[in-house]
Regions:
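Short amphipathic alpha-helical segments
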Residues: 25-29, 41-42, 59
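Short helix-to-turn junction characteristic of helix-turn-helix DNA-binding domains
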Residues: 31-35
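A short, conserved structural fragment
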Residues: 66-76
Length: 117
């Protein structure tokens, strides 16, 4: 897979990532590396090293990312949600491609962390 992305798109992606706080950026990077896999709120909290409860993460950060159409959330049961990056977002699609091509080692680390639960 070859990324055929112009400089303007790469610049926009950098600007988008720079505009996010550390937690939101960590979430998007983790989800981009494990795409197309989805994770629960608890799994996501562990992946990014979030020390609070996944419920507080959901109320603030995750809901903001969902409102901005950066992530997609599917409700599997009343208390279990599947969270994944929105690969249809034009800039996040580029991020997913970058992570897929250049982030194989990091992807392996994330997937190993998910297996260790």
């Amino acid at each position: 897979m070859v990324i055929d992305t112009d400089d303007a798109t790469m610049y926009e992606l950098i600007q988008l990532m720079a505009s996010l706080n550390d937690t939101r950026r960590a979430i998007l990077l983790a989800l981009a590396h494990i795409y197309p896999r989805s994770v629960s709120g608890v799994q996501l909290s562990r992946l990014i090293g979030y020390s609070g409860k996944s419920r507080s993460l959901y109320r603030g950060v995750i809901s903001h990312l969902q409102e901005n159409e950066m992530i997609q959330i599917d409700q599997l049961t009343p208390k279990l949600y599947a969270i994944r990056i929105n690969n249809e977002h034009p800039l996040l699609n580029v991020l997913v491609d970058l992570c897929r091509i250049h982030g194989k080692h990091t992807r392996g680390m994330y997937l190993k962390a998910l297996e260790e639960e």
